[in-house]
Amino acid sequence: GKTSLLRLLCGENIPHTGTVACGSRLQISHVQQDPSGLRGDLSAYAAQHGLDESLFKAILRKLDFARVQFEKDMADFSAGQKKKVLLARSLCEPSHLLVWDEPLNYVDVLSRIQLEELLLEFQPTIVFVEHDRVFCDRVATKAVTL
């Protein structure tokens, strides 16, 4: 249910009833629950997604990414490291709205705190599904409980 709602917000054509309307120029950056499937190095990934590579890597550093990881193949990353790549990408992408599905899945406690600090610093408009009440209370300005 919650994931389907986020997918509809992102414009995916999935079976539903009712109407979902988003502005035609609305730019959304979506992070899915599952971080698998990432391959290649971070520089190529940044280029592929049109990201400012230095900003992208700076955000990864703020998420406790070691510099040695920058040269490795993402296929060898842990699920938590892959999730950080997706979150950093989303924070770098030009968008009006971030839509994140369980951003803390696979992320260790220290990185949760660092992500919280990044969100408080960047203050993006974000819709997210998350089960960690403390995180939600600290970063959300409004909440809908489903």
Regions found by a protein language model. Give the residues of each.
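ABC ATP-binding cassette signature C-motif
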Residues: 1-146
